[in-house]
Amino acid sequence: MVLCTFQPPKAEAEAPVFDAAVLSLRADIPSQFVWPEEEKPTPDSQEELVVPLIDLGGLVSGHAAVVARSVAAACEQHGFFQVVNHGIDAALIEEAHRCMEAFFGMPLLEKQRAQRRPGESCGYASSFTGRFASRLPWKETLSFRFSPSGDDIVRNYFATILGEEFCHLGEVYQKYCEAMNELSLKIMEVLGMSLGVGRRCFRDFFEGNDSIMRLNYYPPCQKPELTLGTGPHCDPTSLTILHQDHVQGLQVFADGHWRTIRPSSNAFVVNIGDTFMALSNARYKSCLHRAVVNSKVPRKSLAFFLCPGNDRLVRPPAELVDLDHPQAYPDFTWPALLEFTQKHYRSDMKTLDAFTAWINLRIAATGATPE
């Protein structure tokens, strides 16, 4: 297998500055944001992907088995479903969206106080212009770590990186991440039941998680048919819990077509990531998805990425490995996969296969598995 890696921009090439206030009004867009013909979107496509609507209230009302079967069917097909009756306060969700508007509405220079450093996964990123030279996404993001074992880790991040005047944002996102953590562990109980390994198996594995929260802002684009808000990829993480605003843009590649998952204010979109696909021994799918943009209004979303604790070994439970189902991927740690996607490979639908090849090369060269 040939391992393809992304190339950083050449020193002599001037990276474009992604200033949403300027670029969203331009009739043309810089060439670095124009995607290849075979990857260009069809923003007006109305083909919808109807994913199962999972009522988490069934976990406490005697219908846990029904919930687990519905989740299993979705995860075996494409890995996407929505959850309702999730227990997250609607006022907290609304405030998280308001705080996102406040942050991305600031001048570029102010947002760059939280600038993401090369090789890191957290901080402010304006279209990843410092990381890639072409096929740039039409978006801004702010990413930060969350761990239930880290005291006020989100509050401290905002106060330290952006200043004390951003304490309210830190307070809101600390509470939001804590709520997402509880929701993700509840979903892990369902996934454990659905795979027949018990309710506690994956919940216990992720109790001490080291996760990522990301705020996504997709400005309007006057040429939405030429670019993408986020390119086609599978999430390398374990589980993604997404809340969309009222603007559609999330598309999933299912049954050979790009299909839209319409926003719902009272539901979270959940999808399986590569790390959980490995934990499930490839029984559940990490599916290709992307985000498209439009010419009229911005789109915003809140994404919580559940990741294992840094010292956890990603290996499927023994119950999922047998002669008919040998282990699909080598053992690895989340930091090793994260480093691979940040420094060596641009996430796509073949990330786990490329990562496996990279691990095998490292083992052949050094005799040790990357940590």
Predicted features, each with a name:
Residues M1-E371:
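Peripheral, non-catalytic segments flanking oxidoreductase cores
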